[in-house]
C-alpha cells in the first residue's frame, strides 16, 4: 500500500505501524511516531493499523547545544 512517510510517498507491505517501522529499518530505534498528525506511543504501534494514504511521521531525537 502507498503511504506518506515524512512527506515522501512510500510503498509498504506492513499493515501495522510497528510492521512498517521494521520494514523501513527502524526496529528498536528510539523514535517518536505520528499517524495523520496524531502521536502514537511505542506501546500502541503494533495495534495501530495503517490504511493507504495515511501520513506517517518518524522523528529521531537530535543532540546539540
Question: Where is each model-derived feature located?
Answer:
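Ubiquitin-like/PB1-type beta-grasp interaction modules and other compact soluble beta-rich domains
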Residues: 1-64
Amino acid at each position: 500500500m502507498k503511504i506518506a512517510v515524512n512527506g515522501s510517498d512510500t510503498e509498504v507491505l506492513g499493515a501495522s505501524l510497528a510492521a512498517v517501522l521494521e520494514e523501513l529499518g527502524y526496529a528498536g530505534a528510539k523514535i517518536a511516531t505520528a499517524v495523520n498528525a496524531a502521536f502514537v506511543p511505542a506501546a500502541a504501534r503494533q495495534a495501530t493499523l495503517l490504511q493507504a494514504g495515511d501520513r506517517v511521521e518518524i522523528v529521531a531525537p537530535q543532540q546539540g547545544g
